């Protein structure tokens, strides 16, 4: 979907996503010392707002103006400051390198998917961390939710290989299970999680 499609989706519901941070973002980032962070494809800002609450200086990048407006209101309500940038990641916006880069549930076809991964990797300062979370391709047939198009899905090792070629040190690349609460009860989604670090020097 393009930006106008997402604008419409964000208009239709009070919150498209949960107000809580992604469980894997919370788990992987909780013990890191706060610094500067980028939340790429931030949506309504749930992860960016949580980071700001933990003491991070956060820039949230999103291509839907409606999502950014909602994110600003949510950040104000939470009493935290988040810098918002309207930009399309497929156009590789000029962003300053930071200590932590989040790329959470951004699903694009090739070659855009790999190009955005490479751009995200270039935004990690030496010693910093890139965390990629998304729906795994296997989720399409064995899990719950997520895009129905296999062309926009990947497996962890595919993401890891792109990041290795940028020079990042891949610390983890694995499938992880996430419980999704539905009207029919709890369902299991199969996500991918890739954690990669920019090696100093």
What are these regions (language model features)?
Residues 64-66:
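Conserved SAM/SAH-binding beta-strand->alpha-helix loop
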Residues 77-89:
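Conserved SAM-binding strand-loop segment of SAM-dependent methyltransferases
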Residues 114-126:
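A short glycine-rich, Lys/Arg-flanked "PGG" loop and its adjoining helix->strand segment in the class I
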Residues 127-135:
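Conserved beta-strand signature within the Rossmann-like core of class I S-adenosyl-L-methionine
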């Amino acid at each position: 979907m393009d930006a106008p499609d997402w604008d419409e989706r964000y208009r239709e519901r009070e919150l498209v996503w949960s107000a809580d941070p992604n469980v894997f973002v919370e788990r992987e980032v909780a013990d890191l010392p706060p610094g500067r962070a980028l939340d790429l494809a931030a949506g309504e800002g749930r992860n960016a707002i949580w980071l700001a609450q933990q003491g991070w200086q956060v820039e949230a990048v999103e291509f839907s103006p409606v999502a950014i407006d909602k994110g600003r209101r949510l950040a104000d309500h939470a009493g935290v400051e988040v810098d918002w940038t309207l930009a399309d990641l497929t156009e590789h916006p000029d962003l300053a390198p930071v200590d932590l880069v989040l790329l959470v549930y951004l699903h694009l076809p090739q070659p855009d998917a790999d190009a955005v991964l490479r751009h995200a990797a270039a935004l990690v300062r030496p010693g910093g961390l890139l965390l990629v979370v998304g729906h795994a391709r296997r989720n399409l047939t064995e899990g719950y939710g997520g895009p129905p198009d296999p062309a926009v899905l990947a497996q962890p090792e595919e993401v890891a290989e792109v990041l290795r070629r940028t020079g990042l040190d891949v610390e983890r690349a694995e499938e992880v299970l996430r419980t999704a609460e539905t009207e029919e009860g709890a369902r299991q989604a199969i996500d991918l999680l890739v954690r990669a670090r920019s090696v100093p020097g």
